[in-house]
């Protein structure tokens, strides 16, 4: 049983049915904010060119934004999601996702996420 908020969120993440989350970890949570890392590899996460498939960054962004929303005590479903790919990423890269809740309304929420590579370079921007 979790004894900290961070442990609790990682226990919830482990119950996620998407297989890629096995390589992810929630590294920080506070009200309206969450951070995650994802260890990628070149066999499960890449397209035929060896670049990360687009679904990886947007999936990480969706997960970290949902976690940020959940820190405010709300269970959410994504109703709109967009992302901008800023830089190509090769398999084997550790990605870091940082999300913040921008709008905490009665019936909707809006969050933003930034995904960084190991060098701290921005590789993806998302809003949902």
Q: Which stretches of residues belong to each language-model region?
A:
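Terminal targeting signals and extreme-terminal segments of soluble enzymes
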Residues: 1-128
């Amino acid at each position: 049983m979790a004894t900290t908020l961070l442990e609790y969120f990682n226990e919830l993440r482990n119950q996620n049915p998407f297989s890629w989350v096995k390589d992810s970890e929630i590294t920080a949570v506070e009200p309206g904010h969450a951070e995650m890392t994802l260890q990628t590899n070149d066999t499960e996460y890449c397209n035929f060119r060896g670049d990360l498939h687009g679904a990886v960054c947007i999936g990480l962004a969706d997960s970290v934004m949902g976690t940020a929303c959940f820190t405010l005590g709300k269970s959410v479903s994504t109703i709109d999601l967009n992302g901008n790919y800023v830089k190509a990423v090769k398999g084997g890269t550790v990605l870091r996702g940082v999300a913040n809740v921008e709008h905490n309304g009665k019936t909707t929420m809006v969050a933003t996420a930034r995904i960084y590579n190991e060098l701290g370079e921005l590789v993806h921007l998302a809003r949902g």
